[in-house]
Structure formats: C-alpha cells, structure tokens
C-alpha cells in the first residue's frame, strides 16, 4: 500500500493489511535512572573503602607512633607523680643508693642487647638488687630520656628485653645507672624500624654537639654528643667505664631493617646548656609533648579529596 504524505508526516506506516500503524518513541524505563544511581552509589562505596584501606596502610606508622606517644606520656606522668610524693630526703636516699650501686656494678656483664647470644647469667641477688634501684613506682621505670633535636622523649626501663625495647628506652644491665658521677658510663638502647613506634629511629640523624638529658628523681643530667660510630654487634670496647669520666652511650641497630651493625652515639656530661642552644627551652619544660595528630588530617583530607574527584568523574561520565 502506498504511504500518504499525511501518514509519513505523522510517523505512521501502512500495515501489511488494514490501517497504518503509528511509530512509538521508546522512553527509558522509569526505574533505569534509579538503577544507574544505585550502581554509582555501590561503586562509590567500594572505591571509598579501597581508598580508606590504602590511606590507612600509608598512615599507619604515624598513627601508631602517636598512640605510642600517648602511652609514653602516661608512663612519664605517673613516674613524675610518684617522685613528687616522695619527701626530698627520700629522693636523695634513692639517688645515693643508685650511686653506691654504680660504685660496685658487677664486671663482665656487658653484652650486645640485640644479640641472640644469651647474656651472662647474673646471680639472683645481684639481679634483684639491680631491679630495685630507682624503682619508686614498682613498674621498672628508671627515669626519662629526652633528645630535643630528634624529638625523642621516652621512659627509661630496667633491662633490655624485647618488651622493654619495644616500648621505650632500656638500660643495659652491667652499665652504670643514669645518675651521673665520675667514673660512670651508662648504656641506653631502644629499637629502630618497628612499625608501631619511632623510638630510636631518629637516632640515625644524631650529630656531634647535640644535647640530650636523663631525668631521674628530681634531677636532670645533661650530656653533649662528642662521637658517633658504627660497630659490629660484638664490639663493646667503647662501652666500658673510663676513670674520671661521666658518659652515656646510646645504642640502636643499623641499617634500619638490616640490623647487621650497631650505631653508637657517645656523649659526655656537661654542667649546663649554653644559652644560645636550641635545647635550652625544650629541656626547661617538664610536660611531655605528644604532638598534633596530623595523620587524622591527612586521612580525612585524603578521603574527602577522593570523594570529590569521584563525583566529578561520575558527573562527566553521565553526561
């Protein structure tokens, strides 16, 4: 059948038999937009979860170190409160007892704190005597270690067990207690490279001339770095006491993650901090500084940036 002009203009065509049929324009199903929107929402949720996991993995070391700093601050505050509750005469007695201990520390007990070799066994009485020194709160906290230029502020504990080295600074048994005095050499150590805390990671940036302190009871003992060296684990020759000298050596493993050698930071006692030294203001304060949790800002900011980028991409895609 021949199609008329009117039929052509109206969009109809003749059927095989009978009257012409009119074309119908197909319209999207009513729920198709909702389906596409639901798919976009699920895609956004999935991508946000992936982004959160990725940011979490990247920022985990910073977050873990911040929470560790809170724990360190709590331990230091508890130690300070215990010391303040002691009478001045009692504090003096504790320090005098520690200095008397230093005058008779057992010889031959120095060992690399990270070596798999078992340490030389101490007599039970000697070990009990050691652990009772400076232990005013019965929690094995000996004092406080601060290295301002490296942002290290940690409690000092008895011994160098794995538990101790993972939570703060350990005092090496067989070395002098960190209470100063001629003919003393204290060895302090902590881990580097563990994922949940910085601890002695920054020690690899130590420089000669840096000033750090130990705080025991109500006394602050100042030390200035005079020598830095890297030695093999079994080389303990520079950890021995030198007559008339008041020294501290800081020890950690190096290189980080390899741990084949030991980084030794040697320092000698000084009477006071030079007025122009950057440590002057920091060491004058007592409050532990845990720092601002920038990792939260980075995490939230990263998720927000990803969310906005996804919305912009999805909008262009729909168009």
Predicted features by range, described:
Residues 1-40, 278-283, 313-319:
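Terminal targeting segments of Actinobacterial cell-envelope proteins
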Residues 32-290:
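Solvent-exposed, non-transmembrane regions of membrane-associated and secreted proteins
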Residues 282-319:
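C-terminal single-pass membrane-anchor helix
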């Amino acid at each position: 059948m021949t199609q008329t002009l009117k039929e052509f203009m109206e969009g109809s065509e003749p059927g095989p038999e009978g009257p012409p049929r009119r074309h119908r324009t197909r319209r999207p199903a009513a729920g198709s937009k909702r389906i596409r929107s639901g798919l976009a929402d699920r895609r956004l949720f999935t991508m946000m979860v992936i982004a959160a996991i990725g940011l979490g993995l990247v920022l985990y070391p910073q977050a873990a170190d911040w929470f560790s700093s809170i724990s360190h601050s709590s331990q230091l505050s508890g130690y300070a409160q215990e010391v303040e509750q002691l009478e001045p005469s009692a504090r003096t007695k504790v320090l005098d007892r520690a200095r008397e201990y230093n005058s008779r520390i057992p010889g031959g007990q120095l060992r690399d704190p990270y070596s798999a070799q078992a340490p030389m066994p101490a007599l039970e009485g000697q070990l009990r005597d050691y652990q009772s020194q400076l232990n005013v709160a019965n929690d094995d906290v000996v004092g406080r270690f601060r290295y301002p230029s490296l942002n290290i502020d940690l409690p000092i504990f008895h011994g160098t067990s794995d538990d101790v080295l993972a939570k703060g600074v350990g005092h090496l048994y067989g070395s002098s207690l960190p209470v100063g005095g001629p003919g003393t050499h204290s060895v302090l150590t902590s881990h580097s490279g563990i994922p949940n805390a910085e601890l002695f990671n920054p020690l690899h940036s130590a420089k000669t001339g840096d000033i750090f302190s130990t705080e025991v009871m109500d006394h602050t003992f100042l030390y200035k770095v005079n020598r830095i060296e890297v030695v093999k684990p079994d080389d303990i020759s520079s950890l021995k006491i030198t007559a008339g000298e008041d020294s501290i050596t800081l020890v950690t493993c190096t290189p980080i993650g390899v741990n084949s050698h030991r980084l030794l930071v040697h320092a000698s006692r000084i009477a006071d901090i030079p007025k122009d030294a950057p440590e002057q203001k920091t060491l004058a304060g007592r409050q532990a500084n845990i720092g601002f949790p920038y990792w939260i800002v980075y995490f939230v900011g990263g998720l927000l940036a990803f969310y906005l980028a996804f919305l912009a991409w999805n909008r262009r895609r729909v168009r």
